[in-house]
Curated annotation (Swiss-Prot):
Residues 4-235 form the ABC transporter domain. Part of the ABC transporter complex UgpBAEC involved in sn-glycerol-3-phosphate (G3P) import. Responsible for energy coupling to the transport system. Can also transport glycerophosphoryl diesters, which are hydrolyzed to G3P and alcohol during transport. The G3P moiety can be detected in the cytoplasm whereas the corresponding alcohol is usually found in the culture medium. It was proposed by Yang et al that the complex could also transport glycerol-2-phosphate (G2P) in vivo, but it was shown later by Wuttge et al that UgpB does not bind G2P, questioning this transport activity. ATP binds at residues 37-44. ATPase activity is stimulated when UgpB is bound to G3P. Transport is inhibited in vivo by increasing levels of internal phosphate. However, ATPase activity in proteoliposomes is neither inhibited by phosphate nor by the signal transducing protein PhoU or the phosphodiesterase UgpQ. Activated by gluconate and inhibited by fumarate. It is found in: Cell inner membrane. It is an enzyme of class 7 (translocase). This is sn-glycerol-3-phosphate import ATP-binding protein UgpC. Disruption phenotype: Mutant lacking this gene fails to grow on both glycerol-3-phosphate and glycerol-2-phosphate.
Length: 356
């Protein structure tokens, strides 16, 4: 059995409306899973269910072969790191890290050894006597993680731990979390609304929407083969271009609303005549020419980002974003002739929104 298993778990506040639809997830021992999605999608509620802070309406939760569905949080073998550091301001770093073990009745020598080891791992050795007010935001977050590490849990639960940090510190802490997981190899479940955190930290990503796991897969899988329109629109910056239209009667072209036809790379005859949504990432559209069969787009604006540029335009009433090389800087109002990589096209069912 996996290090952590959610088996058809649901959550309902009123006994009728499910805020978590039946959800099953197997997390291997030592695996790092990130739950990502917009505010209100249910990811933090699900994490709190694993922690025992919210009751499971239906289904079961298992940690290391033990059913913990009704078990008290303190008995589940979990340690949680929150968005707010929740450090005791009157205690030193050392005392904050040791406090949870002390109230559990652990011996002083064992506590000292665990705190010393956690401080070494997190490079807090020289800060053990300081108070939280004397620390930076990144140092406070490391203390919060140290407090979790000393418990030697079966599972780490992270609830948006980097949200309060500035952009530069978030990058640094992402790297430190990666290094920490490689060192400890503890099963981890991590919640964030930030897709960059999800893609850089996760071994597998669970994309959530409306209490449903839209897709579970590696970061590469959810980026390259999104299972639904929601995943396609949520993962990626800028988001995937999504264009509505229909597959022509021969299954050879996609007819955009507005009359533009785009060639399809075969295998779509069974969808002939059906309303669909075509997706393509901005980096899979290249500049071409009319002679080479390019499709024209009048550019509205150009975003210069430094390493590359983003050209914004329209096909009819549908918006399109194209990622250009650093040296490609067309002027607003100019016509760009575009070539779409046929092997990078994604088709989604017009009714269900699911990938076909």
């Amino acid at each position: 059995m996996a290090g952590l298993k959610l088996q058809a778990v649901t959550k309902s506040w009123d006994g009728k409306t499910q805020v978590i639809k039946p959800l099953t997830l197997d997390v291997a021992d030592g695996e790092f899973i990130v739950m990502v999605g917009p505010s209100g999608c249910g990811k933090s509620t699900l994490l709190r269910m694993v922690a025992g802070l919210e009751r499971v309406t239906e289904g079961d939760i298992w940690i290391n072969d033990q059913r913990v569905t009704e078990m008290e949080p303190k008995d589940r073998g979990i340690a949680m790191v929150f968005q707010n550091y929740a450090l005791y301001p009157h205690m030193s770093v050392e005392e904050n890290m040791a406090w949870g073990l002390k109230i559990r009745g652990m011996g002083k020598q064992q506590i000292a050894e665990r705190v010393k080891e956690a401080a070494r791992i997190l490079e807090l050795d020289g800060l053990l006597k300081r108070r939280p007010r004397e620390l930076s935001g990144g140092q406070r977050q490391r203390v919060a993680m140290g407090r979790a590490i000393v418990r030697d849990p079966a599972v780490f639960l992270f609830d948006e731990p980097l949200s309060n940090l500035d952009a530069k510190l978030r990058v640094q802490m992402r790297l430190e979390l990666q290094q920490l997981h490689r060192r400890l190899k503890t099963t981890s479940l991590y919640v964030t609304h930030d897709q960059v955190e999800a893609m850089t930290l996760a071994q597998r990503v669970m994309v959530m929407n409306g209490g449903v796991a839209e897709q579970i897969g590696t970061p590469v899988e959810v980026y390259e083969k999104p299972a639904s329109l929601f995943v396609a629109s949520f993962i990626g910056s800028p988001a995937m271009n999504l264009l509505t239209g229909r597959v022509n009667n021969e299954g050879t072209h996609f007819e955009l609303d507005g009359g533009i036809e785009l060639p399809l790379n075969g295998g779509y005859r069974q969808y002939a005549g059906r309303k669909m949504t075509l997706g393509i990432r901005p980096e899979h559209i290249a500049l071409s020419s009319q002679a080479e069969g390019g499709v024209p787009m009048v550019m509205d604006t150009l975003e210069i980002l430094g390493a590359d540029n983003l050209a914004h335009g329209r096909w009819g009433e549908q918006k399109l974003v194209v990622r250009l090389a650093h040296q490609e800087r067309p002027t607003a109002g100019s016509t760009l002739w575009l070539h779409l990589a046929e092997n990078q096209l994604h088709l989604f069912d017009g009714e269900t929104g699911q990938r076909v």
